[in-house]
A protein has these predicted regions:
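A conserved active-site cap/scaffold subdomain adjacent to cofactor or substrate pockets
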Residues: 200-244
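Acidic catalytic cores of enzymes that act on phosphate-bearing nucleotides/polynucleotides
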Residues: 158, 165-211, 220
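Internal alpha/beta core interface subdomains
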Residues: 47, 51-175, 179, 186
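Structural motif
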Residues: 17-19, 33-34, 63-66, 103, ...
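Short acidic, glycine/serine/threonine-rich loops at helix termini
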Residues: 10, 14, 77-82, 109-111, ...
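Non-catalytic, usually N-terminal nucleic-acid engagement modules in DNA/RNA processing proteins
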Residues: 7, 16-31
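A glycine-rich phosphate-binding loop feature that marks nucleotide/adenosyl-phosphate handling sites
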Residues: 6, 69-71, 191-193, 230-239
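Single conserved hydrophobic/aromatic residue that forms the stacking wall/gate
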Residues: 1-13
Length: 244
């Protein structure tokens, strides 16, 4: 629903360990259809890496994985903005994982972002180039030297874009609501804990989306009255990734 590749999930499948970031855990269930919802921000390079890692399990990925056309895409320059911004804070860093997540959500709320539905249009690269130029101006303003190669990031990015385009890109909110109305069971999987919620977490040391159970509504397009059972996992102490 608001999955990003910040938090990894390690699973033991057929006596082997496998890590997922973007793709739902249900991909290993032969009877399930998996949907990457509209609330997710997708890193095409990470997505491609995960898809390649799943090939050894002989899963029919094309029929089992659907992607929302409304999900936003993490661009190479989002990662450089993230790293440059964090470096400019000195001792006041917020603990970013430097994956470009925050800057992607900034473009989403600023109505500048590129969504999965955009990449099937023939002129989407024009939009990409315009946004890239804006990002480069912002990166220059930080005046920081970060160890990231834009050329390398773009090569991985465009390869991942082609992988995403090979899957079924859908109006996921329509698909999910039709499934609910037809009596199908929907399991929504969140990525992060409540203390990382943008509104109710330990702000500003939080992520950029709503990670509580209510996020299923906005992250999947499911109405509140359709949510029946909520399961939370508690642990005795707080853990964080990055320097947070």
């Amino acid at each position: 629903l608001h999955r990003v590749h910040r938090r990894q999930r390690q699973m033991c499948i057929r006596d082997s360990k496998h890590v997922l970031h973007t793709i739902p855990s249900g991909i290993f269930n032969k009877d399930s259809v998996n949907v990457i919802g509209n609330g997710v921000v997708i890193d095409p390079a990470i997505f491609l890496k995960e898809i390649n890692g799943l090939k050894k399990f002989n899963i029919d990925l094309q029929s089992k994985l659907l992607i929302s056309k409304r999900a936003h895409i993490i661009l190479p320059t989002h990662k450089i903005i993230d790293a440059s911004s964090e470096a400019s804070k000195g001792k006041k860093k917020i603990g970013s994982t430097l994956k470009g997540i925050g800057p992607t959500y900034m473009d989403k709320t600023g109505r500048n972002g590129i969504r999965v539905g955009d990449i099937v249009n023939s002129n989407w690269k024009n939009k990409y180039q315009i946004l890239k130029e804006k990002h480069l101006d912002l990166i220059s303003s930080f005046n920081q030297d970060v160890d990231l190669s834009l050329d390398l990031l773009e090569n991985e990015f465009f390869e991942g874009i082609e992988c995403i385009k090979s899957f079924n890109i859908i109006e996921s909110e329509n698909y999910l609501n039709e499934s609910i109305n037809n009596g199908k069971k929907i399991l929504a999987e969140g990525a992060q804990g409540s203390l990382l919620d943008i509104d109710f977490g330990t702000y500003p040391f939080v992520t950029s989306s709503n990670t509580t159970s209510s996020g299923a509504c906005s992250g999947l397009g499911v109405p509140p009255n359709k949510i029946k059972n909520i399961r939370g996992i508690f642990k005795a102490y707080t853990t964080r990734v990055g320097s947070g």
